[in-house]
Structure formats: structure tokens, C-alpha cells
Amino acid sequence: MFHKELLKLYFICGTTTCQGKNLYTVVEEALKGGITLFQFREKGESALEGLEKLELAIQIKELCKKYNVPFIVNDDIDLAMEIDADGVHVGQDDIGVDEIRKLMPDKIIGLSIRNEEEFQQSKVEYVDYVGVGPVFDTQSKDDAGGAIGYEGLELMRKLLPQMPLVAIGGIQTKHIKDIIKTNMDGVSIISAISYAKNIEKTVREMSEQ
């Protein structure tokens, strides 16, 4: 069962977005700090594939389970189904959410929506939450598109008054209070957590915002 409280502090990471640190250790520190949701996002030039990717996903899924934090897979529906992940998150150019819902009737499904145009072409009735952004410019995602700012978040809340919404894109600890004022249910963080010197402490500070 999906609750919007899960979106409060949503950590997204893979081996290509943790500055060469051990991903398992990074996620463990973030879990100790109090992240509420984790997304395994294994993308980029040096991303793991095949068996390596599968084995790491299983390890991190089990780690998340220990902390009662749902484990979401980015884009890779086959992997999510193979390891019985708690859900998937997809973008506008991936497989349709209506198709995913048929394959994964009881799982969490998240969808990225940037603006009104994307909203109009999205089948939001099939998803549990929407990721909105990028709020600010970001280096973590090559395909993120232009920043939408706080105004973009406010617009998405008007378009989707009842939908659980999580902001993403270039978010630092100092932004969280203002983002929550736009009626977002939480924030998605990549590099501000994974690049932190003390991940556990950084996550605690974020969750206190």
C-alpha cells in the first residue's frame, strides 16, 4: 500500500552517481539517516549491466528491507519483476504506465512529469506518485531538461491536487523548506546525499527541514 509519507525523503542513486564510493555503503548510511524511499538508478556510461547489476540490486533491495524502506527500480521493468522490487519509476519516453500496471498490479509506480504538456499526455490514473522537476539545474541526469523552479511545482500541484508529488532536480538541504511550501509531499535527492562527506548526518539534517 502506497502512502504519500514515503515521498518525504526519497534517495535516488546508482554506481554512476556516488563519486566512486561503494553504493551499498552509501545506501546503508542514507538508510541509517532516515530516507523514506530508495530508487536504484543504474544509468550512464559506466553503469553495471547483466548479472552485476542484478546481484547489486538484490543486495540493496535486501538492505532496504532491513530498514522497512521500499526499493524502487528506475526504468528497468524486467529487473523490477525478476527481483520482486517494491515498484518502478519511469519517464515520459519509457514503457507506458498502463502497460506497467498490467504487469505489476500491486506495486508502486512513479512517473516523471515536467510541465503541463507532459501532464496532458500522461495516464496519471495508473500511477501512485509523480516526480516533478527538475526544480533546479542538475548534473546528475543528462536528460533532465530545463529547470522549472518553484512556479513549476506550484503549477503541477494545481494540475494534480490529489496526487502524491515529489520534487526532483538539483535540490540541496537549504531548498527543502521552500519546496514543501509549494505543497509537495517530499523531495527526491541524488548528489546532495551521495556526494556528502557525512551521509547519515546530511540525511538527518534534511529530514528535520
UniProtKB/Swiss-Prot annotation:
Short name of any one Pfam family annotated for the protein: TMP-TENI
Q: Which GO terms describe its biological process?
A: thiamine biosynthetic process; thiamine diphosphate biosynthetic process
Keywords for the protein's UniProt record, in alphabetical order = Magnesium, Metal-binding, Thiamine biosynthesis, Transferase
The cofactor binding remark recorded in the entry reads: Binds 1 Mg(2+) ion per subunit.
Q: Which GO terms describe its cellular component?
A: cytoplasm
Q: Which reaction does it catalyse?
A: 2-[(2R,5Z)-2-carboxy-4-methylthiazol-5(2H)-ylidene]ethyl phosphate + 4-amino-2-methyl-5-(diphosphooxymethyl)pyrimidine + 2 H(+) = thiamine phosphate + CO2 + diphosphate; 2-(2-carboxy-4-methylthiazol-5-yl)ethyl phosphate + 4-amino-2-methyl-5-(diphosphooxymethyl)pyrimidine + 2 H(+) = thiamine phosphate + CO2 + diphosphate; 4-methyl-5-(2-phosphooxyethyl)-thiazole + 4-amino-2-methyl-5-(diphosphooxymethyl)pyrimidine + H(+) = thiamine phosphate + diphosphate
Entry EC number(s): 2.5.1.3
User: Which residues participate in 2-[(2R,5Z)-2-carboxy-4-methylthiazol-5(2H)-ylidene]ethyl phosphate binding?
Assistant: T138, Q139, S140, G170, I190, S191
Pathway field: Cofactor biosynthesis; thiamine diphosphate biosynthesis; thiamine phosphate from 4-amino-2-methyl-5-diphosphomethylpyrimidine and 4-methyl-5-(2-phosphoethyl)-thiazole: step 1/1
Q: Which cofactor does it need?
A: Mg(2+)
Record-linked HAMAP family = TMP_synthase
Per its database record, what is this protein's job? Answer: Condenses 4-methyl-5-(beta-hydroxyethyl)thiazole monophosphate (THZ-P) and 2-methyl-4-amino-5-hydroxymethyl pyrimidine pyrophosphate (HMP-PP) to form thiamine monophosphate (TMP).
Similarity comment: family membership: Belongs to the thiamine-phosphate synthase family.
Write down what this protein is called: Thiamine-phosphate synthase 1
Q: Which organism is it from?
A: Streptococcus pneumoniae (strain ATCC BAA-255 / R6)
> Which gene underlies this protein?
thiE1
